[in-house]
Structures are given as structure tokens and as C-alpha cells.
A protein has these predicted regions:
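DNA-binding alpha-helical recognition surfaces that contact promoter or target DNA
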Residues: 112, 119, 138, 142
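Conserved GNAT acetyl-CoA-binding A-motif
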Residues: 88, 117-128
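Glycine-rich ATP-lid loops
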Residues: 102
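Extreme N-terminal starter segment of soluble prokaryotic enzymes
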Residues: 1-2
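Conserved catalytic-core motifs of GNAT/GCN5-like acyltransferases
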Residues: 126-129, 141-149
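Conserved beta-strand-loop-alpha-helix junction that forms the acyl-donor binding cleft
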Residues: 96, 127-137
């Protein structure tokens, strides 16, 4: 597997679908000066998906890296600086193929984008996910991220 910079001219506006399975969600409630998390299982596991595009128009000077098996794109990560507050935002990270999940593809993509944020001297890296995307939450925590709200 190779990690390569994705050419913006070739990928901008190209559509993709991200999929994940989930058995529950984290209920977030205000508590004092912070919040509490409580895991709530669904009655049955569910599959969720959403459609998006590479290099969204709303991103400020985005960059993206792809994970390739030969010529096949099996995953990617995308991010951009938010210059107004010197933060680097990871806008998308996705491993498309179920067989590639848990094999280190996401970790290598995350390392590439974290290095990009360091090169740009970002004061912090942020990202968002759905409260029901259990695997993503676990992955982000494993890679040093904390839940902040």
C-alpha cells in the first residue's frame, strides 16, 4: 500500500460514499462545567452512510492523501488550515473497503495528515464525527484525539 498526495485538479468535486456499521451511540449531556457520555445501544446493529465530495468548496486550501493498492484508491484523508484561528481541520478520513479496515490504512493516512498539520505549524488538529460512529471514535482516541464536546 502506498500513501500519495491526491491531485486537487483530478479529484476536486469527485463524489464518494462513506459507510460504517454501528450498534449504538453516545448520548452527550451537559454536566456542570463539562459533559457526560453514556453509551446507548440500538435494538439491532445499523449501517449508516453519507455522500460527499473530495476537496469541498468550503475548505480553505485543502490537501488530501490517498491510500492505494496498485492503482485502486482504498482510502483517503483530507484536511485544511483554518487560518483565522491557526487550527488544522481534518474534514474527511475514510477507508472504503471493509477488508482494509483495521489493517493500518487509517493509521498511515492519519500520520500523513498529522505531519501536514505540523508542517503548517497548526496549533491544534480538530475533527468531527457522528456520535454513533463507534469505530471512528475508537480510532480517533487511539490516535491521540479527545472528545471536547
Amino acid at each position: 500500500m502506498d500513501i500519495k498526495l491526491l491531485d486537487k485538479a483530478a479529484y476536486a468535486g469527485r463524489k464518494f460514499t462513506a459507510r460504517y456499521q454501528t450498534a449504538g451511540y453516545y448520548d452527550i449531556r451537559p454536566s456542570g462545567q463539562g459533559f457526560q457520555l453514556a453509551y446507548v445501544p440500538f435494538d439491532a446493529p445499523e449501517e449508516r452512510s453519507f455522500d460527499d465530495t473530495f476537496y469541498g468548496d468550503w475548505l480553505e486550501d485543502p490537501i488530501a492523501y490517498g491510500a492505494f493498492e496498485g492503482e485502486r484508491l482504498i482510502g483517503f484523508v483530507e484536511g485544511s488550515m483554518e487560518t483565522w484561528n491557526n487550527r488544522f481541520r481534518i474534514s474527511n478520513i475514510c477507508v472504503f473497503e471493509d477488508a482494509a479496515r483495521g489493517s493500518g490504512v487509517g493509521t498511515r493516512l492519519m500520520a500523513a495528515i498529522q505531519q501536514e498539520a505540523a508542517t503548517r505549524r497548526a496549533r491544534m488538529i480538530i475533527l468531527e464525527t457522528q456520535t454513533c460512529n463507534e469505530n471512528a471514535i475508537s480510532f480517533y482516541k487511539k490516535n491521540g484525539f479527545d472528545i471536547i464536546g
